[in-house]
Amino acid sequence: MATQVFISCDTELSALLYQRGASARANYDASITGRTTAGDYGIGWQMDRLEAHGLKGVFFVDPMPALVHGRQIVTDIVGPILSRGHEVQLHVHTEWLDFAPTN
């Protein structure tokens, strides 16, 4: 019998990059797209690798940056994952509460 494996990936913007003044786009490019001088190695690359082997992954997405950047940034993360047939689950980093504007 083959070994069953559950592949998951924490998918989140960097609170440290935010603290250092990175724009939402720069944070997305670094943290989600995984942009490097050698190419992109983020969630798109990860899904490509999984799909090349007939696999699907589970991406644990942190929605908390929406408190700072708005909901669209989370939609931009979740959309490609779901459109490619992968799974999205909840992953939370509460430090974003410290950055959220007060009501």
Short names for language-model regions:
Residues 1-103:
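Catalytic alpha-helical scaffold of carbohydrate-active enzymes acting on polysaccharides/glycoconjugates
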